[in-house]
């Protein structure tokens, strides 16, 4: 009997030891190993852990609808903060045929829409950059992402006079001087998604053309306008609007004005949605990291950070920003995978 007990104890110890070794080889936590060995509970498989991690990472995709927070909440009749309930009628009813100056409410809300969208982008990027969304981010370039203090990057992004300061000035002048089509001053309805899509495509198409011209018109003009932005050959998210006043005027202001006068039937909510989604997307494609949705975006021809890194690294490819369609048509598109692993990481 004693011999049988000793043999049984030895077998149990061997089983526990082998289980412990197997657990340590599977990269499980100490708590999970204890639960398995002592209490007989099965740990989560690598697949389950991977699925959970991916799901958390993909939760960052909520940043896309959150860009439209202000126009969605204020324009919906079902919203508790619908503009009709929040603002007096005299603040938004405006006779476009009169000689009176436009009401500034639409302008203020438009700037607010962009600001709120940007805040959601910053929050998402902070959580993503520091690994709070399931996994540590992968840098696009093989040499790794630039190191910087997040607060410094954010303050640099906000404080660029050629960025938000110039854009706010443009919005104020065109709105208050009635340089926009009449429908843009209307608060009726909600976001018009067809017109929103048309604005984004036209804006990027015109911006693509201006971008190419900035590169080829003359070396002197390039040095004055676009070269300051191209000093970032390994850009970070906060470099999006870091350039020159001339660059912003040529590549953003002119396309914005032309787009507004081509897509002439937007209401104020669509204009807000366009401004916010455009500014946020332009910011995101300067990211130094790969986002979970980049693979899907690339299959659809939508702009990703890796696509834009190709332009910053080589200068003569991928002039588009939001869409790669114009580069594909013009023969200037290059897939980031073509430069891996020497310049870019695999599968970016």
From Swiss-Prot:
Residues 197-332 form the Fatty acid hydroxylase domain. Residues 12-26 have a biased composition (Low complexity). It is a multi-pass membrane protein. Residues 1-10 have a biased composition (Basic and acidic residues). Pathway: Terpene metabolism; lanosterol biosynthesis; lanosterol from farnesyl diphosphate. Its cofactor is Fe cation. A motif (Histidine box-1) lies at residues 211-215. The keyword Methyltransferase does not apply. It is an enzyme of class 1 (oxidoreductase). Keywords: Endoplasmic reticulum, Iron, Lipid biosynthesis, Lipid metabolism, Membrane, Oxidoreductase, Steroid biosynthesis, Transmembrane, Transmembrane helix. Its main location: endoplasmic reticulum. GO terms for biological process: sterol biosynthetic process. Changing residue 286 to A: Abolishes squalene epoxidase activity. Changing residue 230 to A: Reduces squalene epoxidase activity. A motif (Histidine box-3) lies at residues 308-312. Residues 1-26 are annotated as: Disordered. Its EC number is 1.14.19.-. One of its GO terms (cellular component) is endoplasmic reticulum membrane. The chain crosses the membrane at residues 55-75, 105-125, 153-173, 243-263, 277-297. It catalyses: squalene + 2 Fe(II)-[cytochrome b5] + O2 + 2 H(+) = (S)-2,3-epoxysqualene + 2 Fe(III)-[cytochrome b5] + H2O. GO terms for molecular function: iron ion binding; monooxygenase activity. Belongs to the sterol desaturase family. Interacts with cytochrome b5/PHATRDRAFT_30770. Catalyzes the stereospecific epoxidation of squalene at the terminal double bond to form (S)-2,3-epoxysqualene, the first oxygenation step in sterol biosynthesis. This is Alternative squalene epoxidase. It comes from Phaeodactylum tricornutum (strain CCAP 1055/1).
């Amino acid at each position: 009997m004693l011999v049988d007990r000793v043999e049984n104890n030895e077998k149990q110890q061997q089983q526990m030891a082998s289980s412990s070794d197997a657990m340590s080889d599977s990269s499980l936590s100490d708590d999970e190993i204890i639960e398995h060995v002592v209490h007989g509970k099965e740990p989560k498989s690598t697949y389950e852990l991977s699925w959970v991690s991916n799901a958390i990472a993909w939760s960052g995709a909520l940043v896309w609808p959150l860009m439209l927070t202000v126009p969605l909440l204020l324009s919906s009749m079902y919203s508790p903060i619908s503009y009709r309930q929040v603002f007096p009628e005299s603040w938004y009813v405006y006779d476009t045929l009169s000689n009176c100056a436009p009401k500034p409410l639409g302008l203020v809300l438009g700037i607010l829409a962009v600001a709120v969208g940007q805040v959601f982008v910053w929050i998402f990027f902070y959580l993503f950059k520091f690994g709070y969304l399931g996994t540590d981010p992968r840098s696009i370039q093989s040499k790794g992402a630039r190191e910087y203090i997040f607060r410094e990057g954010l303050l640099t992004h906000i404080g660029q006079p050629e960025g938000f300061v110039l854009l706010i000035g443009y919005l104020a002048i065109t709105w208050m001087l009635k340089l926009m089509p009449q429908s843009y001053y209307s608060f009726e309805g909600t976001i018009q998604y067809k017109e929103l899509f048309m604005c984004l495509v036209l804006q990027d198409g015109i911006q693509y053309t201006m971008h190419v011209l900035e590169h080829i018109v003359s070396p002197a003009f390039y040095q004055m306008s676009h070269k300051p932005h191209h000093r970032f050959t390994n850009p970070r998210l906060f470099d999006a609007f870091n350039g020159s006043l001339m660059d912003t005027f040529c590549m953003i202001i002119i396309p914005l004005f032309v787009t507004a006068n081509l897509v002439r039937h937007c209401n104020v909510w669509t204009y807000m949605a366009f401004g916010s989604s455009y500014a946020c997307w332009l910011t995101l494609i300067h990211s130094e990291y790969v986002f979970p949705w980049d693979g899907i975006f690339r299959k659809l021809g939508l702009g990703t950070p890796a696509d834009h890194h190709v332009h910053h690294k080589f200068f003569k490819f991928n002039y588009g920003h939001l869409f790669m369609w114009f580069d594909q048509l013009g023969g200037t598109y290059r897939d980031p995978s073509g430069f891996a692993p020497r310049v870019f990481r695999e599968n970016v």
